[in-house]
C-alpha cells in the first residue's frame, strides 16, 4: 500500500514530548504517512484533555494537523480514517466536528463504538495520508458530507466501511455480508478496480455468533487468494447493522 517505499521515517512534530507509550505518532514511508490513533492529549505535558466529544475531537484534529504538517502534508492528503467512539450517543456531535476539518473530498472512513484505553477518552481517530494527486470515487448515490465512498491515490484505493443492512437483510449476518461486499464491488468497479485487487480487509461484527455466517459469505465472494484480514467485535451505528467491512485495494501496474 506504499508507493515509492523502502524508507521508514519517524515523524515527530517539533516541541512535542515523546509519547509515554511504545509507539511513534506517525511513520512515513515513501509518499504515505501512517498516523497512530490520536486521543485528546496535551502533547507538551503528556496529559489527557477533558471535555465533550467535540472538544476532544478538536484537540485530536489540531494535533493531527501538526503531525501532517511535520510530514509536509495536510488534511487534503488524508485518504482514510477510522473513528472509535466510546459512547454511541456522541455520533452526531462527532460528525459535526469532524466534517468541519475536511472539504468537499472527505477521506474514506469507518466509525464504530469501541472501548478506549482510558475512561477519560470519548473518541480516538487513526488516519492515513498520501502525498500527490487523489480523487474521490462516486457510485452515484447522494454524497455523504462525512466521508467519501472511496479515495483513489495512484494505484491504491481506500474504501469506506460498507454495511449491508436493509429491510430484506435485517437479522441475517450472511445476507448483510453479501450486500456489503456487493456495495464494495460496485465501488471497486467505479474506480477501475476489481475484487482481485483487494489486499486487506477489516470486518467489524456486533456479535461473534455471526462469525460463521459472515465467513461463508466472505469466502464465497473472494473465492481464493484471500486478502489479509482482521475481524473485530464492535458496535455499529446502524441499529440493524450486524457487519461492516472496510477494504484497501492495490492495482497491478
Give residue spans per PLM region.
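N-terminal presequence-like segments and the immediate start of the first folded domain
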Residues: 1-62, 66-80, 85-199, 205-253
